[in-house]
Every structure is written in structure tokens, then in C-alpha cells.
Amino acid sequence: SRSQLLLVTDELWSHPRSVYTDIPETSNYLDHLGLLAKSLPSTIQQSLELRRHLGQRVVGHPVESWWLNQLPTIDMGDSSIPFSKIVKNAKLVIVAHNGTTIPENFSRGIPTLITWTSNWVEIRDEAKPIFAKLAEVGIFHEDPVSLAKHISAIWDNVDAWWESKEVVEARELFCSQYAKSVPRPRKFLRQIIVGKLTMGQQGDL
């Protein structure tokens, strides 16, 4: 049975590249996630598994010792297991970065929460109403303590919350912009490549 609370983290850069939205090691990223973890009830903390970004050792310092100091019981995860398999076995996924995991999980119906602050992720103006809706139904949280409270509230029946009318509507709103499925994807891609459609029509965070 699915029992894990999976926390998917981003890489932290010792020397962030100015032309990208790299998160620097000097940011409050780890403090934010540490507060989230420590604000969870102990029973849920024991279910917490970390999925660290595979590029962390290349672009910055290892984070294992930091996490184990914060929460000695945390499961540091096994990077040799494919991410798709780990996600499938999770009861609930927390995504702490703006990446493909969010639209992929939404389109596959995997219960997923999002947390970040404007310090690390800047939401484009056209996406703000969508994220406001995600926040309204409890999917998106900028405050780690409110996220921990929400997880505690839904933990005993995650699926009931995830399949509730308002949450389904918010997910569909997001997917209509950022995870749209098309009946003939190869033809659709070919049309984009030859310029008959623009990627802007598909939405972009």
C-alpha cells in the first residue's frame, strides 16, 4: 500500500548562473523545507522520504548531513530506483521546485502538493490566477507551516481530498494550460516544429 510522503527537492548552486533561475545555496530553501518537515506530526515524519536532485553533488555541496541533523529519522531515498517507480508508490508527493514533475503528476492523477516562495520561483503574471486557484484548494503553499497542517488534515484520506470537486477543477485548470493532452501528439508536435502552432498557445510558466 502507498504510505510514503515523498519530498522532491531541487539542486542548490554554489555559483548560480545569472542567466538561469538557479537556486543559490545561500537562499532559505533548506530552512523552508526543514521547517515543513519539523512541523509535521511525528507519525507522518516517519513516512517522509527525500528525493534529492541528482545534480546536487555537481553544482553544490551535499545536503545529506544537513537533512540528517534536522530530522534523523528521514529516509534519504535510493537514487538508483527510477523516479517513476518511487512516485507511483507514494501516498502524497510534495514538489519543491518548478519542473516537469508537477504537470506530469497532475496529468497522471498522482496526489501532489507544491511549495516554493517568490525568492526561488517567480510566477509569470499570466500564471498567477492559476496558482491562486491551486492555493485556494490547498495544492500550492508558500508557508511551510500551513503546508504541514494541510498534510496532517488530509493524511488519513488523501484520495478523498485529491478527488474532491474543487481540487479536480483546479487541477484541470492547470492542466489545460501546462499539461494539455492531445489525441495525436506526433502530428501536434510536427505542426509545432513546422510553425503552424506556437508553443505560446500551450502555456508556459
Please place each PLM-identified region on the residue numbering.
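Conserved phosphate-coordination/catalytic loops
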Residues: 23-31, 77, 179, 183
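Hydrophobic, Leu/Ile/Phe/Ala-enriched alpha-helical segments that form helix-helix packing faces
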Residues: 32-44, 67-71, 105, 151-155, ...
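Catalytic binding pocket for nucleotide-activated donors in carbohydrate/polymer assembly enzymes
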Residues: 68, 92, 97-178
